[in-house]
Amino acid sequence: DEYAYKLFYDLLDRSERGAYDDDFLVQLAAYREAAPDSERADIFAARYLLAQNDPAGAALCGERAFRRRTMSTAAWNVLAAAHRRLGNAADAAVFESYAYRFDHGQAPACSPEMNAAALARLTRAMNGCLDAPLTKRRAAVENNTLTFHPDVFVGEYLPVTVPDGSDRFWVGTYADGGFLSDRGYMIADVRAKDWFHDNICRDFPFDLQKAHEVKGTVQIEVPEGRAVILPLGGTAPLQELIVQTPSHDDQLAYLGKWSYSHLRLCETTTLICEDDAPFAVGAPILLGHSPARKKLVLNILLDALPWNVVRPHFAEWMPNIARFFARGTIFDEHFSTSEYTYPALPAIETGRYAHHTQLFCAESSHELAPEILTLAECMKDLGYHTAAPITSPDGVYNGTMRGYDRLITATWQLPSLLGTSRAIHHIEAFGEADLFAFLHLSDVHPWDAMGLHFAAEVETRLPLAQRLFAWEKATASVRLPDFEIYKAQFRAGLSDADRNIGALLSYIERRYSDDEFIVSLYSDHGSSVFTPRPEGAEPDIIGENSTRAAWMMRGAGVPEGVVAQELTSIVDLYPTLAHLCGFPAASDIDGSLPAVFGGRERDAVYSFCMYPGQTYKLAMRTKTHALRLETRTPVERDGTADFAGAQVGIYPRGHELTEGRALDGRELRAFFYPRARDFVREFANNAEFFAPRD
């Protein structure tokens, strides 16, 4: 849009000269009309209002821009300036921290407002969104100086936003059948050690539960004739609680240091701690079933399962899972929106693409907008107890997992043997309530070979030529080559996953009838290790092997014995569960209800890479063809891209990017081009930049 482009750079020139006069307002009005959805107009308006000494108005405009582009330096700068002038030092420090981290700006200054809550917010601003409850740079005031050091949020609240009316996450360690305080002792000793953050944390389990901290006495009301399960978190080894009920003499309960225990209460109960140590009291879990709910809704994310690779061998490679879902619906043409987990998980949990969640960069610090309701929030509103007995922490700091009552996390190791065992224990413990549960399992996810211990059956069966290879650089999983050792590790992990998940599914069949449960098994993306490529060639990170995903369902309302050939996307799980479970899905989500459930078939699915610093890549697929697009220049940090001169081609499915196979027909262009333009329009930046480009 050449007209909007010229207006932008005219406004930028005036802004840099400080020419905030009536002509500036005329040009700004023209720019708003030319680009009504651009956040850049709000940034110019904020700059104007700052020049007119109206920081409150500037903050409003800046917030609008920030909500649309949470990684915009220009939005951070106007908000930092506005809040400084308003006297909101803590708010200003948050935006100054963003600029400090990403643009080498000035470090946030220490101020009298730096209380515990402000320091927690500042800590979040100085860190990315992975690895909760760990933090590489925790803010503290030492000798009136603001400092940052590695730490872990444990025995305290996690500084993340939760839904209105909900307790915050109080962080404990997960005892996992051992002694209550053992992991509390360990984490107290290593919480500030780099070696723990960089390595040993990978399989360390944390237990995050919605709870509030109490000192002294608390009374738990139990409705007459009902029972509740009460989570309790301790802060000291063998912490004593006096338990008082109307029908029994006083008794003692013992808690562990930073560890949760549970009590079943059948009448109103008073808990008393006579020392000064606080303890955490979770929200009581009211037992009982409702005919409006299912007894179990279970989502199983088998990370990085490429369905097109597995599908021809499904019954052979995954016999237990195949047998279970033969009585449900399997989607054969299912695609991820993204090539890796960080943007894909929010897409699944919200039914929205990454440019709508604004969760595409794990180094960012912001959270999912509160008006975007997650699956767990919706299920909680229906009355389910929501829990993830095993999950990565990828969606914790960014708000994707905020609707869960309980999260048991580990930063890296999420084996199905552990996850399915925890799931069965979870159902046994809390199954008198209606449950919504999520398992995130990593058995088949590929990892860089340089430091990885492969399965024994992989190491002992491969000949040396395949077991050993020259690979001298650390490589992201989405770019791993097609080495035989990676494929063998995948098969070994797949066998583990089928055996362990199969045991869980058999348990569910024995415990519930089909109209009492809904089980979904799916993946968030595929895998690059099945894509041959010449040495030195760039991988196709949004090719079918990397974005073809699994999705299968069984249970109440799910058609039996169906293998659906319609196109589906990972954003479609959200409206499907809305349909089956009875919660309202927002009208502006990107997901759609599949035809097999009474919806309309998609005419296309979209997979894309919007990783800042790399070119934007789009694969728009129908059943027979694919449009492939790649920009000339990288995606900006704020998630926008310049589509001028982008490379575009239309190919037969199965021959994407193959030389000599591009097609150029009028009907194909008429179908693909308008849809592709509509898809990228919201984040096309029209080459309008507040700062010069290299």
Region locations from a protein language model:
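TPR/TPR-like (Sel1-like) alpha-helical repeat modules
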Residues: R84-Q106
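Helix-turn-helix repeat elements of alpha-solenoid scaffolds
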Residues: D13-V26, L50-G62
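Alpha-solenoid helical repeat scaffolds
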Residues: L25-A29, E63-R67, S97
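"A position-specific structural signal for the A-helix of alpha-solenoid helical repeats
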Residues: K6-D10, R40, F44, V78, ...
